Amino acid sequence: MRAVVQRVSQASVTVGDEVVGAIGQGLLILLGIGVGDSEAEARLLAEKTANLRIFADEEGRFNRSLLDIGGEALVVSQFTLYADTRRGRRPSFSDAAPPEIAAPLVDVFAGELRRLGVAVSTGRFGAMMRVALVNDGPVTILLDSAIFREPRNQH
C-alpha cells in the first residue's frame, strides 16, 4: 500500500460538477492499493499517517501530527501509484490491486483514520476526479507499507 501525503491548507475533489470531498488544514492522501495488500496494512498506514509529525510547533519544527493539530484528511484512491515504467513508454498497472479488492481497503484506511479521531472526506472510487489543493510548505511524504517491514538503512 502506498500513500503520497501532502500537507495542505485546503483541498477538494470534484467529480463532474459536484464537489464530493473538501477539507481545510490537514493532509491530502493519494492512496494506492497493491496486489497482496491487506486490512492490517490499511490500518497500519492510517495509524502512521495520522501520527506522522509533519506540522510545525511553535518553534517551527516538525513536532505535531494531524491528530495534534485537529486537522482533516482528504483520501483519494490512486491506482497509478503502482505504475511500472521499467519497460516501454506506457506504464503497466499490474501491481495495482483490482477494484473489488482495492475499494474495500480504501474504506478500511479511511475508517481507521476516523476511528483515530480524524475528520475524513474522500473522493469517489473509480471516478474521473479533479483534485485541487493548496500545498502548505510544500511538504510531501511518500509512505509505502512494504518498507515498514524492512530494517532501517545503517548508512
UniProtKB/Swiss-Prot annotation:
It catalyses: glycyl-tRNA(Ala) + H2O = tRNA(Ala) + glycine + H(+); a D-aminoacyl-tRNA + H2O = a tRNA + a D-alpha-amino acid + H(+). InterPro entries: Daa-tRNA_deacyls_DTD (IPR003732), DTD-like_sf (IPR023509). It is found in: Cytoplasm. Gene3D superfamilies: D-tyrosyl-tRNA(Tyr) deacylase. Keywords: Cytoplasm, Hydrolase, RNA-binding, tRNA-binding. Its EC number is 3.1.1.96. One of its GO terms (cellular component) is cytoplasm. SUPFAM superfamilies: DTD-like. One of its GO terms (molecular function) is tRNA binding. CDD domains: Dtyr_deacylase. A motif (Gly-cisPro motif, important for rejection of L-amino acids) lies at residues 137-138. One of its GO terms (biological process) is D-amino acid catabolic process. The keyword Ribonucleoprotein does not apply. HAMAP family: Deacylase_Dtd. A Gly-cisPro motif from one monomer fits into the active site of the other monomer to allow specific chiral rejection of L-amino acids. An aminoacyl-tRNA editing enzyme that deacylates mischarged D-aminoacyl-tRNAs. Also deacylates mischarged glycyl-tRNA(Ala), protecting cells against glycine mischarging by AlaRS. Acts via tRNA-based rather than protein-based catalysis; rejects L-amino acids rather than detecting D-amino acids in the active site. By recycling D-aminoacyl-tRNA to D-amino acids and free tRNA molecules, this enzyme counteracts the toxicity associated with the formation of D-aminoacyl-tRNA entities in vivo and helps enforce protein L-homochirality. Belongs to the DTD family. PANTHER family: D-AMINOACYL-TRNA DEACYLASE 1, D-TYROSYL-TRNA TYR DEACYLASE. Homodimer. This is D-aminoacyl-tRNA deacylase. The lineage of its organism: Bacteria, Bacillati, Chloroflexota, Chloroflexia, Chloroflexales. The gene is dtd.
